[in-house]
Amino acid sequence: MSAQSVRISGKVLSSDRGSLEGLTVIIQPGNLTAITDNKGQFYFTNIPKDAKTLKIKHAGYLPYEIKLLLKQNAILLPDILLKTDIKQLKEVVITDHFGFRRNKTESLNIETVNSNFIQRNLGGSLMQSLQRIPGVKTISVGSGGSKPLIRGLSFNQVIVVENGIKHEGQQWGADHGLEIDQYAVNRVEIIKGPSSFMYGSDAIGGAVTIKPVPLPFKNTLGGSIDFTGKSNNEQFGGSINLFGRNEKWFFDTRMTVMDYGDYRVPTDTVHVYNYAVPLYKNQLRNTAGRELDLHASTGYVTQKFTSVFYASNVYTKSGFFANAHGLEPRNVDTELHDKSSRDILMPFQEVTHTKISNTTSFQLGNHKVETQLGYQKNFRREWSHYVNHGFMPPIYPDDMYAPQDLERQYDKQVFSVAFKDEFSWRKNQFTVGINAEQQQNNINGWSFLIPAFKQFNAGLFVYDKLRLSELWLLHGAVRLDYGKIEMKQYNDWFPSEITENGQTTSQFLKRSNDLTRTFESFNWSAGVNYTPGKISLKANMGTSFRMPIAKELASNGVNYHYFRFEKGDPNLSAERSYQLDLGMEWQENKWSFQLSPFFNYFPNYIYLNPTSRHDIYYGAGNQVFEYEQGKVMRYGGELQTRYQFLENFSAEILAEYLYSEQLSGSKKGYTLPFSPPASVLFGINYSPQIKNLSDTYFSLDYRYTAAQNQIVPPERKTSSSNIFNLALGTKLKTGQQDFIISLQVQNLLNTRYLNHTSFYRLIELPEASRNIILSVKLPFLISK
């Protein structure tokens, strides 16, 4: 250490002495910064002896500042206790700089957004609200449902974690949306790239992590009310939140209600497999829906011990586009459907997702221990009029085990347990964890696609973060996983005529066999961060894996949404991935720049391959698609840059690119299904200072999406598009409370365009027409 420099270290705590992670500590002059770790600790090296002030400023807490007297070469400051700013209520605002600071200490590419971002970009579902983030897209199912698509991967290749528990729905289906209430979300972290060493199988493409809502401040009682209205599908609804806390006990509750009608598209005719379907008032008939979500949490909090119980129930009922479901798309009673745009007729789906979990953490000396217990039940039913096809009887049997209109039913129950220990040793910060999950999946209904099955997964991991110096940070992780899946035999409930050797007999065809498969995998990850001043560089490489799911191993039925027969392969091996992620970030007072390239190789990628065969037993001679494995290469990246022209005027550019290619198999040279095309977004933002208002903004986005000509049959090429979106909002002060208003105009020019990753892309269905979204939030404080 130079005779003219000093080393300073310390710890930042809340008023109840809880550790505060991710805060920026600033020393001036020189504007030197450090980030607090998960214990609230920070340190500086090589501080000039003329440094005078240490400052900490973070949303939700009062600013902190002390004068420095640097008379020694090494100074350990007393614990710094930040006082809460009661005017912030419970909802701590995470600024745009949080993600930048977080990325300086992580070798993976992580995007962080908060509830303000979601309200400002509010869509019909959580993932639709997040797709402004480069590298993040959705597979949308109508206006109220979607699933995440991260760098072109989705379904069981991307996981969603809510309050520390892996969300387990029926994510294998393209028409199955994510059962998450976006109004209950406070902060989301999106990991772009493999995350298997943290979460195990299914995180081979990335993770969407929904962080727990911050605990209420001591001795408060308050809440908020949200109102939302949308013009396109005439949606109305809202969410009400009530929370409270004394010294150690707290509660937090929420109820969300939504009701919406058929959504509109900028065309009066769509073509369902060459059949022209007229649309009444441009409405997509039978795409209305309803949603009712209930949430509650309660817990006990002390300085060294916290235990929180979470419970939620998310219910949705939504219709399928009536002209694009089943084997008879022409036989639709359009007059009945067009009588009302708000009724939900057949075909429709009902989904109820229930979660109960507990997260307990406590401090044991140098160890921070966390345990998690969880239970989930996902109950999904798809209703459709019974239509016989193949050898199915023309009249539905009275003694059938399933109701006549119950096409399919999936009943999943999941029990999970996890244990994690975080501790420091010298310059190392270790995390050791173990998790296990047991699934029971049952089926019902007159139509078959996948069998009932049981599944068990368990994993053990060790992660080390080694700080070599203020500039260098190393990461290393290893993980061992074990998985087992047991599928049950299934026979048709009706006999089919089988002709062999000139003789015809009636048989109850076996659709799936009893099958048990086990999988084991060892994976590793290594990374580095280098932060020389305002520039931050990172690199991460490692392996990931994914167990094949029941649909890939044992599906054997008609997918009515795609008019195809899907057949699994019981001999598939576990999917494996090798990935290299790089990152460069630079931030000045007015400029910020971020580049995140990646390279990905799969030696045995699992995909659904069309064959030349056609089904002869189950209807209209649908083409047979079989699951296969092959070598796949993927590369691409994301670019983000922002510039503050004036105090109130800024601009940004967000770009993304992905290239995928199959290197072996019958589709060698082709890309992968649902590969999003390149796109770039140009945004401008004006934030004027207006009396009695705060956080006022006017923004205009222009997104250019390139044509997608690299496809996998039966996909179709998608033309380029040019879309404008407008947004504005403000906070109106009413006493000590804020009245928050947000207004969006999506698809400002009512442009007709196709989304290559949409569920309805195959039938040339354009995206929604102009949509005006009004959102109003009223936080309130009853007592303090």
Task: Report residues per predicted region.
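Outer membrane beta-barrel strand-and-loop segments of large Gram-negative receptors
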Residues: 399-420, 567-574, 579-580, 585-588, ...
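Gram-negative outer-membrane beta-barrel transporters
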Residues: 470, 598-602, 618-708
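Short, acidic, small-residue-rich periplasmic hinge/interaction motif at the N-terminus
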Residues: 13-15, 23-28, 57-61, 71-119, ...
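Short acidic/polar hinge/loop motifs at secondary-structure boundaries
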Residues: 43-45, 165-192
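Transmembrane beta-barrel wall of Gram-negative outer-membrane proteins
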Residues: 233-259, 272-321, 352, 358, ...
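C-terminal beta-signal and adjacent terminal beta-strands/loops
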Residues: 260, 266, 601-604, 608, ...
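Flexible loop and strand-edge segments within Gram-negative outer membrane beta-barrel domains
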Residues: 285-291, 304-363, 377-413, 441, ...
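N-terminal periplasmic accessory domains that precede
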Residues: 76-81, 126-129, 144-149, 161, ...
